[in-house]
Design a protein with these regions (language model features):
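Cell-envelope/ECM-targeting effectors and their regulatory/trafficking segments
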Residues: 784-883
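Conserved "right-hand" nucleotidyltransferase catalytic core of DNA-directed polymerases
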Residues: 2-124, 169-171, 187, 195-200, ...
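Acidic beta-strand-to-loop metal/phosphate-binding motif
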Residues: 82, 145-153, 452-454
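Conserved beta-strand -> loop -> alpha-helix junction used to position metal-binding or nucleic-acid-contacting
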Residues: 166-185, 192-193, 481-485
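C-terminal structured "cap/appendage" subdomains that terminate the fold
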Residues: 711-769
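Structural signature of nuclease core domains in nucleic-acid processing machines
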Residues: 94-146, 157-161, 166-171, 735-737, ...
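Conserved pre-motif C helix in the palm subdomain of viral-like polymerases
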Residues: 233-240, 689-712
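Short active-site loop/helix that positions an aromatic residue
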Residues: 90-91, 100, 154-166, 179-183, ...
Length: 883
């Protein structure tokens, strides 16, 4: 571009910052180095492509406040409009808005540029509006009753709120992407351009996405008059896709009725769309995290991971040295110490080529679901190493990088993160933080003056299974407040209920009138078997997986484990025929309709249920036996397989009992008859297991979502200052003022139970309160010490707990018998009392000239309340400056 567009002062300013600007551009551009000439050529090619593609566009570029004011006035008058943002990237915290697009019916789409930059110099283009100017006009929309249409509203609402300081939640009327996830959740190409081309243009267009035009990070350097062509079009086609979708989601519309989408309509308008505002609030609120705790966890887990990797490599070396394992396939690693458990070629070679392990599915999968079924210690060790690797790389190392300027992590919440309708989150995925890794979860804490409150449904999915299956025995067990798994074990195995409890009543009572119970190992085993079967049905697990879960540590062969698991599985289903009926009905529904439905009518499409077990296709060289070379009329069918042949082969293959027989016959047909056989049995088996799981898991997700809506709209909860900040499957995490924790706990539990009022038995929620997620419960049950002399065990626990809650890594001592403490104790919480520990505290006070009274005062007034900053306490290592 010509420098004549700038004044001398502007040119001088640009020259002064040129080097800095070039460095900035290099950082924002792809890693491959670009010369100025090369960059300009790339930008020109980009612009030419956009101009050519949108040559018929009528989009307008808004470059003045007056022009924007008039456009917004027309949009408000129309009552409807669509909005889209263009940004520097997808990071909602660190990326920024470059421009905003608007459209209203009967008008012309527009683009409002704000942060487009001149290449090389990073100087802003002329005639752009500031964030404040755009925000002022968008606030007029926020103050009106305009109904806005979005494509991925969650992202646009977040960016507008962060950069433009405008809250458009109440104007958010419709999201074309979210609606389509409800209508057809299994369609993978569900981006705006693909949906618009497929359904509005009937597949006749040429859909090009953002990445087809703009190389990474270069959109801000696109000229505004070029950018408008692409950006404004997004707003326009969003609205047009909305008008196409609308008849299918309006209950009174013939298209909705014809496709039996009335329940989906209720789900969209009554649950998913109202929940968009709740997700926005959770994203904005965020959750505090102490990144420096990651240092401690890194020191803890790295040595463990290294030790487990060395153990694995030692096992690999033993296998390599074992003469019974041989293969002609070249080894993909040089030495055992080079073996990488994350490498698919390494693991596949070891398991399949060398050890000849059989997945039972004919493939070479190295995923968790397959390796977990192998009765081989090395496979279990591979999974253990992978689990530790994920723990360190995904959580310990990455979580601190996700912290925003306010010290919080602001997740992106996906309302339909799974095809079942379950929530998920990203940046980071909080649902993937393992519950067993309590110390990872303890990185998250409440803000000062607040506590975290966790409330989860007690046996949510078993209760929904009882409700959906209408099993009278299960329903009655819940009505009688009996342990459901012990009841199932009792009926299935013909054993008294008390003998299926983990802790069996003795018939005696203590001084307070409580029943005295004794540990019952056989009862625990029976209950565990019943629980594994019921959850296996719910989660769609195969008998092979169930066998591994139940009998992994038994010295039996794989065949014996599977046989035993099948026996237990059949015993439970025979005792509870309604469960078997649920499985059969769900599978039949999927076969007939191609989908199953939840209690609210959400559909989970499972097309593989409608596949034939075997498909037959002619290969090169196939000759139709019905062809008469002298009859010209038969020649058109010479490459087709006659139906009678298909029927005969289908009957033959379905008669085989074992996989090996089927595989052998398929090879013979290919080699001798030139008929390719597609075996769909595995796909159908996998699909069959999804049927019940989709109903139960999807219904559980809906129950949790209904609870979130009740909580968000509850005046009493809001008056108490509580707010939900995180959903994790059947659990909701809330942050509440410390002074209202009891009232909030009662209210949260009631509202969640109210969301399950459709059940024929009482619902129950387990509520815990703590400073940290997965921390010790608040209020602390330990006494406050009055002296540091001769501390009791409870008092040491109390001191350790509160110091840990305020971010101190405490010394850990072995128990009197020499054992190192585990769990919380290993972190200095629930610490062990020893003379060494007592003397440590006294020596600490003497060394730093702190009286015992001062120490106690600090514990009482600073640490206990959590409302004041923690001052440095000598050689206690402070791992966070936040309390």
């Amino acid at each position: 571009m010509s420098l004549g567009l700038f004044s001398r002062a502007q040119i001088a300013q640009v020259n002064a910052i040129a080097e800095k600007s070039k460095a900035s551009l290099e950082q924002s551009a792809p890693k491959t180095a670009r010369s100025t000439k090369g960059l300009n050529a790339e930008l020109k090619a980009m612009s030419d492509a956009v101009i050519e593609y949108f040559k018929d566009s009528k989009a307008i570029l808004i470059t003045s406040k007056e022009q924007l004011h008039d456009y917004v006035t027309n949009l408000i008058d129309s009552g409807y409009g669509s909005l889209d943002t263009e940004t520097t990237g997808l990071d909602r915290i660190r990326d920024t808005i470059v421009g905003v697009s608007l459209y209203y019916p009967g008008g012309v789409e527009c683009y409002i540029p704000s942060k487009h930059l001149v290449p090389i110099f990073d100087a802003p283009y002329k005639d752009q509006l500031t964030y404040e100017e755009i925000g002022e006009e968008l606030q007029r929309i926020a103050d009106s009753s305009v109904k806005l249409i979005f494509a991925n509203a969650d992202f646009d609402l977040s960016m507008i709120y962060k950069d433009l300081k405008v809250d458009l939640i109440k104007n958010c009327y419709y999201d074309v992407i979210l609606a389509w996830r409800c209508l057809k959740e299994n369609e993978r190409n569900n981006r705006l351009k693909e949906l618009y081309n497929k359904y509005v243009l009937k597949g006749k267009g040429d859909p090009k996405t953002f990445s087809d035009f703009f190389p990474p990070k270069l959109f801000p350097y696109c000229k505004p008059e070029v950018a408008k062509l692409y950006a404004a079009n997004d707003a326009k086609i969003t609205y047009e896709l909305f008008t196409w979708q609308l008849p299918y989601v309006m209950k009174d519309n013939p298209k909705c009725k014809k496709n039996h989408l009335e329940a989906i309509s209720d789900l969209i308008w009554g649950v998913e769309f109202p929940l968009m505002g709740v997700c926005q609030k959770m994203h904005r609120d965020g959750i505090y995290i102490e990144p420096s705790m990651a240092e401690m966890l890194n020191r803890k887990y790295l040595p463990i991971a290294d030790a487990e990797l060395k153990k694995l490599q030692g096992m690999v070396q033993e296998i390599l040295d074992n003469p019974k394992y041989t293969t002609r396939v070249k080894r993909p690693f040089l030495r055992a110490t080079d073996f990488n458990p994350e490498s698919t070629p390494h693991v596949a070679w070891l398991c399949y080529d060398l050890m000849k392990l059989d997945s039972g599915k004919g493939g070479r999968s190295t995923g968790k679901e397959i390796l977990g079924t192998f009765n081989a210690p090395v496979a279990k060790q591979i999974l253990k190493c992978r689990s530790l690797g994920v723990l360190i790389s995904t959580f310990v190392k990455k979580l601190p990088n996700a912290v925003g300027p306010d010290g919080k992590i602001h997740c992106t919440f996906k309302q339909i993160g799974a095809d079942t309708g379950r929530f998920s989150s990203a940046d980071p995925n909080m649902q993937n933080i393992p519950s067993k890794a309590g110390d990872i979860r303890r990185m998250f804490r409440a803000m000062p003056g607040h506590v975290l409150m966790s409330s989860d449904y007690s046996q949510q999915e078993p209760k929904l299974t009882a409700y959906v299956s209408q099993d009278e025995k299960m329903v009655q067990a819940f009505k009688d407040n009996k342990d459901i798994y012990s009841i199932i074990a009792s009926i299935a195995f013909g054993v008294p209920y008390e003998d299926c409890l983990e802790f069996k009543p003795t018939g005696k009572f203590d001084e307070d009138g409580n029943p005295i119970k004794v540990y019952n190992a056989s009862g625990k085993a029976r209950r565990g078997e019943a629980k594994t079967i019921v959850l296996g049905i719910t989660y769609g697990r195969s008998v092979v997986t169930i066998a591994d879960q139940l009998y992994a540590h038994e010295p039996w062969s794989d065949e014996e484990k599977i046989k035993k698991a099948q026996h237990v599985f059949d015993s439970v289903l025979n005792a509870f025929p309604s469960l078997r009926k649920l499985m059969i009905n769900a599978q039949n529904c999927a076969k007939t309709n191609g989908y199953v439905e939840t209690i609210l009518g959400r559909r989970r499409h499972i097309p593989d249920m409608q596949l034939p077990e075997f498909e037959f296709k002619p290969m090169k060289g196939y000759v139709n036996p019905d062809i008469d070379p002298l009859d010209v009329s038969t020649l058109d069918n010479q490459e087709s397989i006659p139906q009678r042949v298909v029927d005969r082969l289908y009957k033959e293959l379905t008669s085989y009992k074992y996989f090996g027989q089927v595989a052998k016959r398929i090879r013979e047909l290919a080699e001798n008859d030139h008929i390719k056989v597609i075996n769909n049995r595995f796909k159908i088996q996998e699909a069959s297991r999804k049927c019940v799981n989709s109903i139960i898991q999807g219904s559980a997700a809906e129950q949790t979502k209904l609870a979130m809506l009740l909580i968000d709209n509850d005046p009493e909860w809001n008056a108490l200052g509580g707010h939900v900040i995180l959903p994790v499957h059947d659990e909701l995490i809330a942050e509440v003022p410390i002074e209202n924790w009891e009232a909030c706990a009662n209210r949260l539990s009631k509202l969640m139970c109210d969301a399950a009022s459709f059940l024929p038995f009482a619902s129950k929620c387990d509520v815990t309160v703590s400073y940290r997620w997965n921390g010790m419960e608040y209020p602390c049950k330990y006494p406050e010490p009055n002296s540091l002399d001769n501390l009791t065990e409870d008092e040491v626990m109390w001191v350790q707990y509160h110091l840990f809650e305020c971010g101190y890594e405490l010394p850990v001592f072995k128990t009197p018998d020499g054992d190192k403490p585990e769990g919380d104790a290993a972190l200095g919480v629930n610490g062990v009392v020893t003379d060494q520990y007592n003397s440590y505290i006294r020596d600490y006070c003497n060394r730093y000239n702190i009286t015992e009274d001062e120490f106690i005062y600090h514990i009482h007034t600073k640490v206990h309340t959590g409302s004041a900053p923690v001052k440095q306490l000598g050689d206690y290592k402070q791992i966070s400056s936040k309390s």
